[in-house]
Amino acid sequence: MATSAPLRSLEEEVTCSICLDYLRDPVTIDCGHVFCRSCTTDVRPISGSRPVCPLCKKPFKKENIRPVWQLASLVENIERLKVDKGRQPGEVTREQQDAKLCERHREKLHYYCEDDGKLLCVMCRESREHRPHTAVLMEKAAQPHREKILNHLSTLRRDRDKIQGFQAKGEADILAALKKLQDQRQYIVAEFEQGHQFLREREEHLLEQLAKLEQELTEGREKFKSRGVGELARLALVISELEGKAQQPAAELMQDTRDFLNRYPRKKFWVGKPIARVVKKKTGEFSDKLLSLQRGLREFQGKLLRDLEYKTVSVTLDPQSASGYLQLSEDWKCVTYTSLYKSAYLHPQQFDCEPGVLGSKGFTWGKVYWEVEVEREGWSEDEEEGDEEEEGEEEEEEEEAGYGDGYDDWETDEDEESLGDEEEEEEEEEEEVLESCMVGVARDSMKRKGDLSLRPEDGVWALRLSSSGIWANTSPEAELFPALRPRRVGIALDYEGGTVTFTNAESQELIYTFTATFTRRLVPFLWLKWPGTRLLLRP
């Protein structure tokens, strides 16, 4: 009770006479009375004159209103005493925990000194050090910073929303991609199952045809065997009778010689065809089907492997590397050989002696594929004539019957002369082997000046093609397919695998594979010394 009376007395001293509450931001007017700043603004002037004090009724000027800092600090201390009345000694109040206190005066910090950038209590604000400085209420000083923080917070929230949106969209894209992969998995299984079913049906169909041909051949074999046995039995009977007749005495033999011989006239012995013409035609057609099957499966396997394993690339030629003997098209995908050297300026990257040219695009990794088309005047006509000759030979073979008359055909002098002419033509073709072209890959750092061997040790992996056949440009040179002239050569480069594979792009037939360890950039390589021939890059 002793301590509560002084506290109540102090509370009465710091109570505003207008709002009857603690003085908030206390100010004094001209008469000396003290009120809350907000309460003085509510005091209205009487009959248009200056406002008057609510206690003494003396007029005052609002511009003379001055803050009372010490009284504001006293109000805070009274409030703290009132709160700390039931607190144990040494216990820190919640307000002291939540609010920072002035280290010097242990008062609550209310102001912010804009000159020093420090937080001040009421006593620091009235001190000689900070009185001439500009000090504002801490909440007012914090407002611009709070607005900046709120603006930055708004930006961060927008960024967060964007990230969440991106994340949601990305998650949706991933789920869609996974769904697409699942659909593709089902598609692959279904397509391959359909392909397997189709191949199984074709297999069963071919095996049924084969079984029918086997049955027809077996039945024909029995007929052929039975006919032969009957013919042999007939001949054996005639031979036996004639042998007996030949052993008779002359007198007996001469009695009915004419009649006997008339009973057994000389007949041409039977020469039957072991395979009927119809069956032979069917077997030939079946063999053609198997060849078509083999060719189709090879082409399918080659194309599927190429499309799935290798990336088909479009390559062009580098005009700066082209020899003066070569002429490039405007799109740099076609090269033609000219016998005259047309380059007026020798570029440092240009081939000077060898009629070669490199590709403009190089490869240092991956599996890539492109094709080179060889256009040679007269090749198509020659091949068509060759196809017609082969068809004629097949027709002649089909027209041949059985065993004939039991004699073999021997070569005549004319045949020997024709063979000799063919040998002379082969020798002439060997002499013309210099007219050829090369297709393949090469290191972009290969030598380009002087005479070159153009072999793997020089950084070139290529095939040489001519009218006489195909050679692998190895050391020594390896002849691959004599007289084979592919119109399109496929080049498959597996950089990491260290292989360069050449195929017939039309039939997918393997021609040759180089193996090496690649460490430099590789580019397409063409070499052409063959008048009337063009090399075109595809696609």
UniProtKB/Swiss-Prot annotation:
Gene Ontology biological process: host-mediated suppression of symbiont invasion; innate immune response; positive regulation of non-canonical NF-kappaB signal transduction; proteasome-mediated ubiquitin-dependent protein catabolic process; protein K11-linked ubiquitination; suppression of viral release by host
Highest taxon, organism lineage: Eukaryota
Zn finger (RING-type) start-end: 16-57
PROSITE patterns documented for this protein: B302_SPRY, ZF_BBOX, ZF_RING_2
Coiled coil: 188-227
Domain called B30.2/SPRY: residue spans: 295-539
GO molecular function: ubiquitin protein ligase activity; zinc ion binding
Region listing for Disordered, in residue ranges: 376-437
UniProt key word Transferase: yes
PTM info: Autoubiquitinates upon viral infection. In turn, autoubiquitinated TRIM26 recruits NEMO and bridges TBK1-NEMO interaction.
Keywords: Coiled coil, Cytoplasm, Immunity, Innate immunity, Metal-binding, Nucleus, Transferase, Ubl conjugation, Zinc, Zinc-finger
Binding site for Zn(2+): C102, H105, C124, H130
Catalytic activity of the protein: S-ubiquitinyl-[E2 ubiquitin-conjugating enzyme]-L-cysteine + [acceptor protein]-L-lysine = [E2 ubiquitin-conjugating enzyme]-L-cysteine + N(6)-ubiquitinyl-[acceptor protein]-L-lysine
One Gene Ontology CC term in the entry: nucleus
CDD domains from the UniProt entry: Bbox2_TRIM10-like, RING-HC_TRIM26_C-IV, SPRY_PRY_TRIM15
ZnF start-end (B box-type): 97-138
Subcellular location: Cytoplasm; Nucleus
EC number: 2.3.2.27
Composition-biased stretches (Acidic residues): 380-434
Main location: cytoplasm
Quaternary structure and partners: Interacts with TBK1; this interaction bridges together TBK1 and NEMO in order to activate TBK1. Interacts with INCA1.
Function: E3 ubiquitin-protein ligase which regulates the IFN-beta production and antiviral response downstream of various DNA-encoded pattern-recognition receptors (PRRs). Also plays a central role in determining the response to different forms of oxidative stress by controlling levels of DNA glycosylases NEIL1, NEIL3 and NTH1 that are involved in repair of damaged DNA. Promotes nuclear IRF3 ubiquitination and proteasomal degradation. Bridges together TBK1 and NEMO during the innate response to viral infection leading to the activation of TBK1.
Record-stated family: Belongs to the TRIM/RBCC family.
PANTHER family referenced in this protein's UniProt entry, alphabetically: E3 UBIQUITIN-PROTEIN LIGASE TRIM
Name the UniProt record assigns to this protein: Tripartite motif-containing protein 26
Gene this chain is encoded by: TRIM26
